[in-house]
Regions:
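Short, flexible helix-loop junctions that flank or precede catalytic/ligand sites
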Residues: 1-351
Length: 351
């Protein structure tokens, strides 16, 4: 059996994002988005059980035995922060470990566009970061909160499941609350946050109607609210939010959203030529024109508004991909696989 510390050391040296530990398979790392075996010796049930016992608390171990799964985060030997999911499959124990650096990367290190960083300086409003699981949303939001923490005097409350990046208060007071351990749900924590004198609120997942509604209310009442959604692209985010509500409420939500939404950032991570990954962003800054489109149910026009809004820092995903291909950061094949309109993208490249 390979001890867990050795596994984690090797994963960090290879810049792995995840470790998968499953009975009957060798340890598997995710490197630049691809799964790669670490060694050839398959793990046994005794191995994976020992890994779980090294990481988990007694309370969560009880939950795992009762429910067949448990989700938590842990700082391991001052090496790394990990988001851990332990689960049963075919009656055996498996682990999925997401590796998170202890040091929060700066906005500059992540390559966040200036217009995205500028959202952290807004006094109020709703800022959304969207994308699939593993697209770097948590890193982006951590960098934005870190920017606020080192430049402004504000009270930040985060609601996360679990807490991923740990923030040490600098200029700000930061309270990080974990769903399950510190509050019952995102919606409950968000309702409570409104009574805790916050300036900035981070909602780790806007996954249900009540959480979305309360987040919009928090932005309406003068707070800067950051949230995430699993939508693809900034433009699709508006329809996703409005469609979450019953038909009789949609017009009111449309009015509220048009009033409070400041920016939506869609992002994904793609493999670079020569190794490593890079973030690609679609950015919608909510101008008066886009507010009008939201109010008038003309969200189908938003893509055109983004395309012509470069002076505001806006960009479509496909335009960002084209720039990366031109600069030889990613391959054309990678760009085509990620493009929203691959046929149009390919035709544009040929002409």
């Amino acid at each position: 059996m390979i001890d867990l510390e050795t596994l984690i050391h090797d994963a960090l040296e290879r810049n792995a994002s995840d470790i998968h530990l499953t009975v009957g398979e060798p340890p598997i790392f995710r490197l630049d988005g691809e799964l790669t075996n670490f060694g050839e010796v398959p793990l046994t049930e005794a191995d994976t059980t020992a890994y779980v016992q090294e990481l988990i608390t007694p309370g969560l171990l009880k939950e795992f035995h009762e429910m067949g799964e448990a989700d938590f985060a842990v700082t391991y030997h001052d090496l790394v922060r990990m988001r851990c999911n332990v689960f049963r499959q075919r009656g055996m124990t498996s682990l999925a470990l997401r590796l998170l650096p202890l040091r929060i990367a700066t906005a500059e290190e992540l390559g966040l566009p200036p217009v995205v960083v500028a959202q952290a300086d807004k006094p109020r409003g709703l800022v959304l970061v969207t994308g699939p699981t593993g697209s770097g949303k948590s890193s982006t939001l951590a960098a934005l909160l870190d920017h606020i923490n080192h430049s402004q005097r504000r009270h930040i409350i985060t609601l996360e499941e679990p807490i991923e990046y740990l923030h040490a208060s600098d200029q700000c007071i930061i309270n990080q609350r974990e769903v399950g351990a510190d509050t019952g749900s995102f919606a409950a924590g968000l309702r409570a946050a409104l009574r805790q004198d916050p300036d900035v609120i981070l909602v780790g997942e806007m996954r249900d109607l009540e959480t979305i509604s309360t987040a919009i209310t928090a932005a309406e009442t003068g707070h800067l609210v950051f949230g995430t959604l699993h939508t693809k692209g900034a433009a699709n985010t508006i329809d996703r939010i409005i469609d979450s509500f019953p038909a009789e409420q949609q017009n009111q939500i449309r009015i509220q959203l048009a009033d409070v939404l400041e920016c939506a950032v869609g992002q994904t991570l793609l493999p670079k030529i020569g190794g490593g990954r890079t973030a690609v962003f679609e950015i919608m800054v909510v101008t008066p024109a886009i507010r009008s489109m939201i109010l008038q149910s003309k969200t189908f026009q938003i893509v055109s508004a983004i395309q012509t809004g470069k002076r505001y820092g806006m960009q479509l995903l496909d335009d960002a991909l084209e720039d990366l291909v031109d600069r030889h950061v990613i391959s054309l094949e990678t760009a085509l696989a990620a493009a929203n309109e691959p046929d149009k993208f390919k035709t544009g490249r040929q002409t």
